[in-house]
């Protein structure tokens, strides 16, 4: 998720 949410995805 770009804006975040579950599991810390690469928010780049």
UniProtKB/Swiss-Prot annotation:
Gene Ontology CC terms: extracellular region
Localization per record: Secreted
Segments crossing the lipid bilayer: none
InterPro entries: Periviscerokinin (IPR013231)
Keyword set includes Secreted: yes
One of the GO BP terms on file: neuropeptide signaling pathway
Residues carrying Valine amide: 12
Keyword Glycosyltransferase applies: no
Top-level taxon: Eukaryota
Alphabetic keyword roster: Amidation, Neuropeptide, Secreted
Pfam family, one: Periviscerokin
Protein purpose: Mediates visceral muscle contractile activity (myotropic activity).
Family: Belongs to the periviscerokinin family.
Full protein name: Periviscerokinin-3b
Highest classification ranks of the organism: Eukaryota, Metazoa, Ecdysozoa, Arthropoda, Hexapoda
